[in-house]
Amino acid sequence: MKKFLFMCAGTLVAVAAFAQEPTTNWPYLYPEFKEGELNVRSKTEKALFNIHLDLGALHYVEDGRIKEANILNASTLVIGNDVFRNVAGKMLKVLVRAQGGYIVEETRATYSAVVRNDGAYGTTALNSTTTKTFLYNENAINQYNGYLMTDVYKDLLAMRDDAEKLPVRKNLYIVIGMDQIPADKKSVASLSGLDKKALKAFLKSEKIDWNEIGDLVKVIDYIIANRNK
């Protein structure tokens, strides 16, 4: 098996990374905005960044206010030890870089878990436009990036813990070239250019566990070696 070329330290200390869980007032990956570098073409933009957990929008702080970054031409984002790649307009965390591809992780908020039957979202309606700020960037890919109680960074940070915990789910993807493939048997088997019978035999012989990063690297190697042959 080929050696991993890159593995984010965050995958080994996931619990520590989420010492502060996201809340309904703070739907972000990190407990505060962090210094990072966004690579856009040949330029590097530095700012305080965070990932909104609704549609993967990249937010940053400018003059004390939260704004959405235009990532149309962005390639990568580095925040501390975490590396993100622009995958179909979302900044997804890179867990492993292998020969010819990547394993990335998407963290998404599960709002339905905190929306009560009466439609309440904490103490305000989920679709409220009177108590929440709607961030909009006409140049951004994700025109909808969720509601915030305020776009003033220090005020939103002060509200962070005065809310319900926001459950999240994590989705793994295999990225090869322009293909973003959900890391599951059905999605890989549906790829064009692969012999379904041979793939089935490979998955069985290797006892592929779709939750194991090492096994997903094997799948990447197999796809690259056998697709369109």
Positions of PLM-derived features:
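Bacterial Sec-dependent N-terminal signal peptides
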Residues: 1-23, 219
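Short N-terminal segments immediately surrounding and downstream of signal-peptide cleavage
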Residues: 21-39
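Glycine-rich, compositionally biased intrinsically disordered regions
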Residues: 34-40, 44-51, 58-60
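Short, solvent-exposed mixed-charge patches
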Residues: 20, 228-229
